[in-house]
A protein has these predicted regions:
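Feature captures the catalytic ectodomains and active-site-proximal regions of enzymes
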Residues: 1-387
């Protein structure tokens, strides 16, 4: 099959190698005077993130679901975020989903290297796993054995902290892609002052430090109510207040960078395609993975299945074989050992369309979704300020 594919106008390719989420922690390491090239794979002397300030203490905050387009569209609701300095042209990785993105941030590696290839996908041990709940997941070190960015920073004497929900400290995703830092649990995630106090505590030491802060509520509201709902808009304003509170505790030798793991689109009920109800869509398909906006399709007949999905979905999706996706560089640097995890066919949904499956009934209640290549899902902010 021809590997040349015409990209739909609304699709954005990941900007690996300088303007992607995987490049954030290497940039922070460079700002601390460390040489990141051995572990990030960066070889070019130019630094796309050279605008980041020099600082002894860094706070790296990731707001789940806070796509760049959404922030710009609602700028009046996020005055502090809007005033922050910005590095443009940033994208998340592919697929545009939390598990993949958090592992990119935590390791400084691209998906094809770290191997967390979506929300659900075939685990190294065979069955479809859920990378958030870790259902059917292997030992986290089997999943991702390379040192994380936090572990590499610690090797150079940098203190590292992670500030997040209590239940995440022992999760498979944390232990796979974000392991290493001292974990500071947030028991009341609505308490802005508590979060700011925890950040302030990490800035008091004399040793250089990097503190990772994870905030998830905006994504949760977007999934349940829609990413342009009144509830979402209120939560964006709350998120802006949280970021401002963290900014206010910065010390003169510290800096804050704020980014996101993906954006979001709302999917109307009449744009939800139920796989089991589409004649022929599941023919020769062994398993479905991924999520509604990007499906991993596992099959022994990839060319035939890809053609069938293209015929049925038509202009509602870009359907690729795994070889085509890898040829396009969608997963970045590719480790062939990850091949069994990747779908043999990949369906990237266009517009506001989604492919649902009754095997994953919780999907049916979602309004806001992500995972595909539209600019609303792929473009993320990279904002920063100094103390």
């Amino acid at each position: 099959m021809d590997n040349l594919v015409e990209l739909p106008d609304e699709f954005v390719l990941p900007r690996y190698g300088g303007h992607c989420l995987a490049d954030v922690m290497p940039a922070v390491a460079r700002s601390l005077g460390l040489d990141d090239r051995e572990w990030s794979g960066r070889s070019a002397p130019a630094d796309p993130m050279a605008a980041l300030p020099q600082a002894r203490h860094w706070v790296v905050m990731l707001v789940d679901g806070m796509g760049r387009n959404l922030v710009e569209e609602h700028a009046s609701l996020a005055p502090f975020l809007t005033r922050m300095n910005s590095i443009p042209d940033m994208t998340c990785a592919v697929p545009s989903t939390t598990a993949t993105s958090l592992t990119c941030l935590g390791t400084g590696m691209e998906p094809g290297h770290h191997g967390t290839l979506g929300y659900t996908f075939r685990s190294p041990e065979g069955p479809i796993m859920n990378a958030l709940s870790w259902a059917n997941g292997p030992d986290p070190l089997t999943m991702q054995a390379s040192p994380t960015a936090f572990e590499r920073l610690a090797e150079h004497g940098v203190e590292t902290f992670s500030i997040g929900p209590t239940g995440f400290v022992t999760s498979g995703l944390t232990q796979s892609g974000l392991r290493g830092p001292r974990y500071l649990s947030v028991r009341d995630e609505d308490d802005i002052d508590l979060r700011a106090e925890l950040v302030a505590d990490t800035l008091r030491g004399t040793t250089a430090s990097v503190s990772y802060v994870y905030e998830r509520s905006l994504d949760h509201v977007g999934h349940g109510s829609g990413c342009r709902s009144a509830q979402w808009r209120r939560r964006l304003t709350w998120t802006d207040e949280l970021v401002e509170a963290i900014g206010e505790v910065l010390t003169p030798d510290s800096a804050l960078v704020v980014t996101a793991d993906h954006g979001m689109v709302d999917v109307p009920d009449d744009h939800m395609i139920i796989a089991e109800d589409q004649a022929g869509l599941l023919a020769d398909v062994d398993e479905l993975g991924g999520e509604p906006r990007t499906r991993h399709v596992y099959t022994d007949h990839p060319d035939e299945v890809a053609e069938r999905w293209r015929s049925i979905l038509a202009d509602r999706a870009m359907v690729l074989t795994a070889d085509q996706a890898l040829h396009m560089g969608l997963l970045g640097k590719w480790d062939p050992a990850m091949r069994n995890r990747l779908g043999d066919v990949l369906a990237f949904m266009r517009g506001q369309w989604a492919v649902m499956t009754r095997q994953m009934p919780r999907e049916m209640s979602l309004i806001g979704m992500h995972g595909s290549l539209t600019d609303d899902e792929m473009l993320i902010p990279l904002l920063y300020c100094e103390g």
